[in-house]
């Protein structure tokens, strides 16, 4: 007993020390009899007991136990007897152990996972009697046998496959784990085996995620002939193979390639060829009840969603297929026609991918995908507007556009002549409503019933390059040799041999032509070509005989949910465009029987009566987003149910024949009342007109998709799963692939740069010149600017040093806003910028905080001139003399400025010196400043007498229209105002009656400009119009109509807010524009300029942008240039947008 006590223990648990009780007696031994009949027989002749009583283990057995600590003693003795006298006997013994005694997995060396499982099963309390140890071993074996049987019974049966088809080959390096007594020849067939089937799948992947184990431990290579283990594959291959071995959906054929002429030892590397085949089982999953292609939601556990075992398996099968396709370079086909043409020219040239050829494989990975191919792997890049180019290109390929045969509307319907691309667009729009144009060679490629479902990818069956086919020249895959393509949905794991097409959608779309290409004319042409539903008549709606209807039909007609206005198209537009659309309708329509009605301002008491009860209802009803929103809000407050909308009389009581949304991106934010209201409107056909379907976020498209009722994408769950979530996870390519596939059939976009079939631009526009004019701040502006700049830099540096720049975000933006305002006019300080989302909420008190500009100017500032102004009697005497000399019949007599020689001088800009000589104000001030810089006394240019600008007179027209003289107030005008006045004067001199548009993002600045221009110019020389969001519809209409009328005697200037001017206005009557201040986004300014430079413009367009030299405006231009080069960022969320804005702010404060 003492000897036993000193013997080295072989187990970590005391209770296991005497638990191995088996016998080794000829045919009753474990080698020949797997089932032990009686524990008592084991105890009687237990070799373990014999060793415990005094026999020492041999060195061979000790070495064997060191490698295989759980090997049974009788097995170890038998292996010792067989191999102890042979060279490499230990390696051969280990190999035979795994070949012969591991088949039932009873004695296999447990992985870390099995050890944990075994320890749990074998753990017993310390106070258990020792005679239970023997029972424990037998019980443990029985449990393992039962577990194996039950797990085998639970596994789904491997479905029989009727055929398999080759998809690709890999050459894989395998590490040898078992030695061989003889070489494994070249061409020897090998097989995969999944070991440790008794370990739960979930536990395997949990350990894999924790990086405690790899799947390579569970995937082994065996000889196909004698099922002898050879080695293990690399981890990346194991991750592909492990989930796919469980089912007969993917078949692998393995062949020994190298070395083939020598015995293998543990640790050697060999090369095998892995040929991959897809089987018929993969394409018949719907017939296999054990597999679900639906994305389950898992089971709920304590309120959380837990992935089921089956869902885990299906997910990893999908991942295995994706990784396999990547490895074998099986890429989706993007353009089937182009691919087939290329295939015909080049033939099929598949290759075997050698994963060990680092150089060739590295070159493959670095290759750019072909134009007709898309890599399966998701590429993550910075998301910007440049990536939107691919989105737009998907809808504007030359092949697609050129295939559209022009449709010319009859002249009795459409008064104007459409351009060729507009006629092609009309063809496309009619097709989108399911109307056959009747062309003999009509291209049916646009039919979305043949378009591939966007969740699916098309793959080509490659030529069979398997080892068996290359060696025998026989395919032998029992598949249809005529098959060229197969289709896979890598999101759900479904595969099909038939093309999965989209559900037929023929009820509208998105016309997304670039601004200025005439979307309005195109839409109205569609309305005039097809003004009503041809398949519906008033008689069929209201006077059908009940005998011809089923009972269900009669009930449906008796109580309709909404009345069908089958002759009316509803067009919803921004308020500023309401009258413009009405004018365009009158301009285009040549059929007196088709009319247009405005639905605005309560002019229609009952829209339902107008559209349903009248024999000839209006063809078009024009209304605004505001009217739709107001009606919806009222119905919501009244508690009106959607089902009972038919009982109301407004816009929601009707199902329209067609609804058209102009500037459709207005509904992009699905949470706004406007968007919710528009989505509740009812119609048979739905159209969206927008030049910018995406503005800030990819989700901008969702409301458009929901309005168009594109199923299943209009369901928020689908949209989030396949677009929003990948986008937020920065899988931009995946999100855009799906979006492109969704939008391609329903969106048409043309740009001004595109060319027609003859190589000419779609539209010939006159040239456009944009000039940046840099100005210097006035002295007063400069003092104020420097003060605000110091404050802004102090706040920025403080936030940068403390690391809380985002916390000071709003404060910094206010400082920047004030700097921009000072560059325009210091009187702007304290007003809002309605275009800035971060400052337009009105919650920021810093914006509206009053600032006394006078306190910012140093007290030490000396008066420019110490000469006192006039005394009262002096002023009166001078006024009396000048009036008699220069005013006749309430007009300033013609007089020439001797400085600039301009004649006559405008009374509003004339200044009279004390010596009674008249000059232009700008000329005299410039002359005075020059004299002062030279430290010379200011003298009259005419008589050379000493003069002082503080002692001069100016002309002013009172409210009664009488011209009078007043003391000249020599306050300094802001730099931009002076520059604008100078350019307007030059235009008056060179181009009489020229109409001018002045843009600014500050509505308050427009007020200042209006006041200042009216002070400088008389009404008979210059007329100022102002157009911003504060005007009513009537006022807007009057402003635009009056401005568009050319008057050669009066110069017309339209002051336009950037926000109002960026939407739909047609201002081709003007050819000059001035941008008074820059904005962060260059696209917003481009939209405004396109109001002038668009179809209908006959003159060259010149745009002058005023920028203060060396100011924050100059740096804003650099940000604009950067955005034009790199693309404007699209943000995933609010935080992302703020971070990008902070980057821009940092650029502003860079030296």
From Swiss-Prot:
One of its GO terms (biological process) is error-free postreplication DNA repair. Its main location: cytoplasm. InterPro entries: Helicase_ATP-bd (IPR014001), Helicase_C-like (IPR001650), HIRAN (IPR014905), P-loop_NTPase (IPR027417), SNF2-like_sf (IPR038718), SNF2/RAD54-like_C (IPR049730), SNF2_N (IPR000330), SNF2_RAD54_helicase_TF (IPR050628). A motif (DEGH box) lies at residues 662-665. The keyword RNA-binding does not apply. Residues 979-1146 form the Helicase C-terminal domain. A zinc finger (RING-type) spans 897-944. It holds the Pfam family Helicase_C. Residues 39-49 have a biased composition (Acidic residues). Keywords: ATP-binding, Cytoplasm, DNA damage, DNA repair, DNA-binding, Helicase, Hydrolase, Metal-binding, Nucleotide-binding, Nucleus, Zinc, Zinc-finger. ATP binds at residues 513-520. Its EC number is 3.6.4.-. It is found in: Cytoplasm; Nucleus. It is an enzyme of class 3 (hydrolase). One of its GO terms (cellular component) is nucleus. Probable helicase, member of the UBC2/RAD6 epistasis group. Functions with DNA repair protein RAD18 in error-free postreplication DNA repair. Involved in the maintenance of wild-type rates of instability of simple repetitive sequences such as poly(GT) repeats. Seems to be involved in maintaining a balance which acts in favor of error-prone non-homologous joining during DNA double-strand breaks repairs. Belongs to the SNF2/RAD54 helicase family. PANTHER family: DNA REPAIR PROTEIN RAD5, TRANSCRIPTION TERMINATION FACTOR 2-RELATED. This is DNA repair protein RAD5. It comes from Candida glabrata (strain ATCC 2001 / BCRC 20586 / JCM 3761 / NBRC 0622 / NRRL Y-65 / CBS 138).
């Amino acid at each position: 007993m003492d000897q036993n006590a000193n013997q080295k223990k072989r187990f970590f648990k005391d209770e296991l020390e005497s638990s191995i009780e088996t016998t080794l007696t000829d045919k009753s031994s474990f080698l020949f009899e797997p089932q032990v009949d009686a524990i008592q027989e084991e105890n009687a002749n237990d070799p373990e007991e014999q060793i415990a009583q005094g026999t020492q283990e041999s060195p061979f057995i000790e070495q064997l136990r060191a490698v295989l600590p759980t090997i049974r003693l009788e097995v170890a003795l038998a292996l010792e007897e067989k191999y102890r006298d042979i060279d490499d006997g230990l390696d051969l013994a280990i190999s035979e152990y795994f070949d012969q005694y591991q088949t039932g997995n009873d004695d296999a060396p447990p992985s870390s996972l099995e050890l944990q499982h075994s320890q749990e099963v074998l753990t017993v309390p310390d106070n258990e009697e020792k005679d239970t140890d023997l029972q424990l071993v037998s019980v443990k074996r029985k449990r393992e046998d039962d577990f194996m049987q039950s797990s085998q019974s639970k596994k789904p049966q491997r479905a029989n496959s009727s055929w398999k088809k080759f998809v690709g080959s890999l050459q894989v390096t395998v590490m040898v784990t078992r030695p061989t007594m003889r070489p494994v020849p070249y061409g020897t067939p090998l097989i995969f085996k999944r070991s440790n089937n008794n370990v739960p799948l979930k536990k395997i992947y949990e350990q894999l995620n924790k990086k405690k184990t790899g799947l390579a431990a569970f995937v082994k290579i065996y000889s196909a002939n004698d099922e002898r283990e050879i080695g293990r594959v690399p981890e990346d291959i194991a991750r592909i193979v492990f989930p796919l071995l469980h089912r007969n959906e993917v078949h692998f054929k393995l062949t020994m390639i190298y070395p083939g002429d020598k015995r293998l030892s543990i640790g050697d590397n060999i090369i095998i060829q892995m040929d991959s085949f897809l089987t018929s089982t993969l394409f018949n999953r719907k017939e296999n009840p054990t597999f679900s292609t639906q994305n389950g939601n898992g089971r709920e556990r304590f309120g959380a969603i837990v992935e089921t075992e089956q869902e885990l398996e299906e997910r990893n099968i999908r991942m295995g297929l994706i990784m396999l396709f990547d490895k074998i370079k099986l890429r989706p086909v993007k353009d089937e026609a182009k691919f087939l043409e290329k295939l015909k020219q080049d033939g099929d040239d598949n290759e075997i991918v050698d994963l060990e050829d680092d150089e060739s494989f590295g070159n493959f990975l670095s290759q750019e995908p072909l134009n007709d191919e898309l890599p399966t792997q998701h590429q993550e890049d910075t998301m910007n507007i440049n990536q939107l180019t691919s989105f737009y290109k998907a809808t504007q390929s030359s092949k697609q556009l050129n295939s559209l045969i022009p449709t010319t509307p009859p002249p009795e319907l459409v008064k104007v002549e459409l351009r060729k691309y507009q006629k092609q667009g009309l063809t496309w729009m009619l097709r989108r409503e399911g109307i056959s144009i009747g062309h003999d060679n009509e291209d049916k490629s646009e039919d979305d019933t043949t378009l591939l479902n966007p969740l699916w990818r098309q793959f080509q069956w490659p030529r069979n390059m398997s080892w068996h086919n290359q060696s025998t020249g026989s395919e032998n895959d029992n598949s249809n040799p005529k098959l060229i393509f197969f289709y896979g949905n890598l999101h759900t794991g479904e595969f099909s041999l038939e093309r999965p097409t989209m559900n037929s959608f023929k009820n509208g779309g998105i016309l997304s032509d670039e601004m200025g290409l005439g979307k309005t004319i195109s839409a109205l042409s569609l309305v005039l070509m097809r003004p009503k539903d041809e398949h519906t008549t008033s008689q069929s709606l209201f006077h059908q005989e009940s005998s011809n209807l089923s009972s269900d039909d009669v009930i449906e007609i008796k109580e309709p949910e909404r009345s069908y206005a089958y002759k009316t198209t509803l067009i919803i537009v921004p308020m500023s465009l309401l009258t413009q659309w009405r004018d365009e309708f009158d301009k285009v329509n040549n059929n007196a029987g088709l009319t247009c009605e405005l639905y605005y301002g309560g002019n229609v008491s009952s829209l339902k009566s107008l559209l349903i009860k009248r024999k000839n209802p209006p063809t078009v009803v024009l209304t605004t987003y505001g009217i739709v929103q107001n009606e919806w809000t009222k119905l919501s407050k009244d508690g009106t149910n959607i089902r009972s909308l038919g009982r109301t009389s407004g816009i929601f009581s009707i199902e329209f024949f067609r609804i058209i949304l102009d500037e459709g991106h207005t509904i992009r934010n699905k949470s706004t009342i406007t968007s919710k209201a528009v989505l509740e409107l009812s119609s048979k056909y739905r159209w969206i007109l927008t030049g910018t379907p995406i503005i800030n976020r990819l989700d901008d498209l969702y409301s458009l998709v929901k309005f168009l009722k594109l199923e299943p994408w209009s369901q928020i769950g689908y949209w989030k799963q396949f677009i929003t979530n990948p986008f937020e996870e920065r899988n931009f390519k995946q999100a855009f692939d799906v979006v492109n596939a969704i939008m391609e059939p329903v969106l048409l976009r043309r740009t001004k740069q595109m060319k027609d079939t003859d190589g000419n631009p779609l539209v010939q526009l006159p040239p456009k010149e944009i000039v940046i004019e840099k100005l210097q701040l006035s002295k007063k502006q400069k003092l104020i600017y420097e003060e605000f700049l110091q404050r802004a830099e102090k706040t920025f540096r403080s936030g940068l040093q403390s690391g809380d720049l985002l916390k000071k975000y709003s404060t910094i933006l206010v400082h920047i806003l004030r700097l921009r305002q000072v560059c325009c006019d210091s009187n702007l300080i304290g007003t809002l910028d309605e275009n800035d989302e971060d400052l337009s909420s009105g919650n920021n008190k810093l914006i509206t905080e009053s600032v006394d500009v006078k306190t910012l100017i140093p007290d030490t500032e000396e008066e420019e001139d110490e000469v006192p102004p006039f005394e009262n009697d002096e002023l009166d005497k001078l006024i009396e003399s000048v009036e008699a000399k220069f005013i006749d019949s309430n007009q300033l007599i013609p007089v020439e400025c001797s400085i600039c020689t301009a004649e006559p001088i405008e009374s509003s800009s004339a200044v009279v010196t004390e010596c009674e000589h008249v000059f232009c104000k700008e000329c005299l001030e410039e002359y005075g400043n020059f004299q002062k810089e030279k430290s010379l006394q200011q003298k009259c240019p005419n008589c050379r007498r000493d003069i002082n600008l503080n002692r001069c007179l100016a002309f002013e027209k009172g409210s009664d229209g009488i011209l009078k003289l007043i003391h000249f107030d020599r306050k300094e005008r802001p730099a931009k105002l002076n520059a604008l006045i100078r350019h307007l004067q030059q235009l008056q001199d060179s181009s009489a009656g020229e109409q001018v548009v002045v843009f600014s993002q500050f509505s308050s600045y427009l007020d200042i400009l209006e006041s200042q221009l009216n002070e400088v110019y008389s009404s008979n020389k210059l007329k100022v119009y102002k157009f911003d969001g504060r005007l009513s519809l009537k006022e807007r209409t009057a402003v635009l109509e009056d401005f568009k009328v050319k008057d050669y005697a009066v110069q017309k200037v339209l002051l336009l807010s950037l926000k109002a001017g960026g939407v739909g206005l047609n201002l081709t009557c003007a050819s000059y524009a001035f941008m008074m201040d820059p904005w962060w986004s260059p696209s917003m300014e481009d939209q405004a300029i396109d109001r002038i430079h668009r179809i209908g413009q006959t003159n060259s367009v010149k745009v002058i942008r005023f920028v203060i030299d060396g100011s924050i405006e100059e740096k804003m231009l650099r940000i604009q240039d950067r955005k034009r080069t790199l693309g404007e960022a699209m943000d995933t969320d609010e935080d992302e947008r703020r971070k990008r804005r902070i980057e821009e702010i940092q650029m502003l404060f860079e030296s």
